[in-house]
């Protein structure tokens, strides 16, 4: 009798997990109990293939499950524009695994994870302060060009001495130096690069952990984190979290000890935030406090590094697979620049093929397999499909990037798709590497400037060749939250002696 009751309850639970709970949402693949559909994404990383299959089978609005959490995906441009631009307020909140996020971050904090007035205040302050420090202006260009020259010189020295060079660690250091200078006022040099190296090592450790689909269990069901082996998984995660936070807390404390609150001038973002905290300290509901500060710094620092650095890495690899594209870039530089001088943003309008290459690079590399999740603030109906209030929802930008109706023959790398018959750059509104709507990446301006200046000057100075022409670097993405290239080496030949 007991076994019969247990069996009946088990069947009912499985029925609820795989069918009953899915009824209020748009159709989608059947979720497994506990795991949902996360196993499919992990087994077919980066997950683009199953997303395309589900779009074809269920339509452009479909539901998948991240453990116990339903996620509605939107995978066509017209609907994405209607929802996230024309009706952006309805989808502006962030969706998260609340209990886990609160424990990992110390609360629902920062810019990425927050919603409502807190998110608006923090985002507004960050954007305003970044503009004050030269975002999109000549001052920021000078900082990036300084790092660009340093990067090119390091690559040239190492390539000359060793014959080949692994560019990713140097690209990482240069891109990280730009954002770290803005936030904390110093770049990563020989004395401080160990900090960046350790941050990268911790990120690799997190990536290894996240490959295990069982990690979703203590995240989705926090009480399970007290039970072995989930407790061990969570403890490992939190140990890395503590060390990561320590880097930011240390830098904030250094600034706090030396800051002069009577001086309105700020040397970096950290100074500006400390002074804003001081200005608002008597406000009872202020969102400018210590825990918020650390999380905002983490959000800005991470957003300012990963996507730009990884895109640069893919840019090098793709040139090795497409030497004819590199030849066209060199021809454009020889025609327009004509010397070994640095390329600046003043040259951008005269370098349409470079701009087209970067556009196609962002489309083809498609490094964000899953956009950060948003949340409906009310029940909504779109294209006849009703989505309940409080539902996680995401514009599937990665699916748009390989949609053959938008980009014919999407598996082919072709910068010329962005060039018209007169050799002018074509603006394609469906190209959304920085997302769309109210949650669009706040660092887009900085990232665009970095990609242009770093990349154009790299290819202008060097002919980039494979270390082994018979064994080109893989185009397979390494498992990560951002699609990373596998380690690779190149040969560099200076074009101007």
What are these regions (language model features)?
Residues 298, 421-451, 476-478:
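Cytochrome P450 heme-thiolate "Cys pocket" and heme-binding signature region
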Residues 323-326, 444-482:
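Cytochrome P450 heme-binding "Cys pocket" and the immediately downstream C-terminal segment
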Residues 395-422:
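Conserved cytochrome P450 K-helix/beta-meander segment immediately N-terminal to the heme-binding cysteine loop
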Residues 21-42, 47-140, 166-167, 171-181, ...:
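Cytochrome P450 substrate-recognition site 1
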Residues 38-59, 242, 246, 342-384, ...:
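Conserved cytochrome P450 K-helix E-x-x-R motif and the immediately C-terminal K′/meander segment
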Residues 94-103, 137-312, 328:
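Cytochrome P450 heme-thiolate monooxygenase catalytic core
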């Amino acid at each position: 009798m007991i076994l019969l009751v247990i069996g009946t309850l088990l069947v009912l639970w499985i029925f609820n997990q795989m069918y009953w709970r899915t009824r209020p949402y748009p159709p989608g693949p059947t979720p497994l109990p506990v795991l949902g559909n996360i196993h499919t994404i992990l087994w077919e990383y980066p997950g683009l293939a199953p997303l395309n299959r589900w779009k074809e089978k269920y339509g452009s609005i479909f539901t998948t499950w991240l453990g116990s959490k339903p996620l509605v995906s939107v995978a066509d441009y017209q609907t994405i524009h209607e929802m996230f631009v024309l009706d952006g307020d309805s989808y502006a909140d962030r969706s998260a695994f609340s209990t886990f996020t609160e424990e990992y971050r110390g609360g629902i904090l920062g810019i990425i994870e927050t919603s409502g007035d807190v998110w608006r205040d923090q985002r507004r302050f960050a954007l305003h302060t970044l503009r004050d420090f030269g975002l999109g202006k000549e001052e920021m260009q000078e900082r990036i060009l300084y790092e660009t020259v340093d990067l090119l010189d390091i690559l040239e020295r190492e390539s000359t001495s060793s014959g080949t060079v692994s560019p990713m660690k140097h690209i990482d250091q240069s891109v990280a130096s730009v954002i770290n200078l803005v936030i904390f006022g110093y770049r990563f040099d020989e004395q401080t690069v160990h900090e960046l190296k350790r941050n990268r090592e911790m990120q690799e450790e997190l990536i290894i952990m996240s490959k295990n689909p069982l990690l979703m269990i203590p995240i989705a069901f926090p009480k399970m984190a007290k039970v072995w082996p989930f407790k061990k998984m969570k403890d490992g995660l939190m140990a890395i979290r503590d060390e990561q936070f320590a880097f930011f807390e240390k830098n904030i404390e250094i600034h706090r000890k030396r800051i002069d609150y009577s001086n309105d001038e700020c040397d970096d973002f950290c100074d500006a935030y400390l002074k804003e905290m001081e200005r608002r300290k008597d406000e009872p509901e202020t969102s400018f406090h210590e825990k918020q500060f650390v999380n905002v710094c983490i959000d800005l620092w991470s957003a300012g590094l990963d996507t730009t650095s990884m895109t640069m890495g893919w840019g090098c690899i793709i040139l090795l697979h497409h030497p004819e594209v590199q030849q066209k870039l060199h021809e454009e530089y020889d025609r327009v620049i004509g010397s070994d001088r640095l390329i600046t943003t003043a040259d951008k309008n005269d370098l349409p093929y470079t701009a087209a290459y970067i556009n196609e690079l962002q489309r083809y590399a498609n490094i964000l397999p899953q956009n950060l999740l948003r949340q409906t603030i009310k029940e909504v109906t779109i294209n006849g499909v009703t989505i309940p209030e409080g539902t996680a929802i995401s514009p599937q930008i990665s699916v748009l990037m390989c949609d053959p109706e938008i980009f014919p023959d999407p598996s082919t790398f072709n910068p010329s798709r962005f060039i018209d018959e007169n050799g002018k750059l074509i603006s394609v509104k469906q190209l959304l590497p920085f997302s769309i709507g109210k949650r669009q990446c706040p660092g887009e301006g900085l990232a665009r400037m970095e990609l242009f200046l770093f990349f154009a000057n790299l290819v202008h100075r060097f002919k980039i060749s494979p270390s082994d022409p018979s064994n080109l670097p893989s185009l397979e993405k390494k498992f990560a939250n951002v699609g990373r290239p596998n380690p690779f080496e190149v040969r560099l030949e200076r074009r101007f002696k």
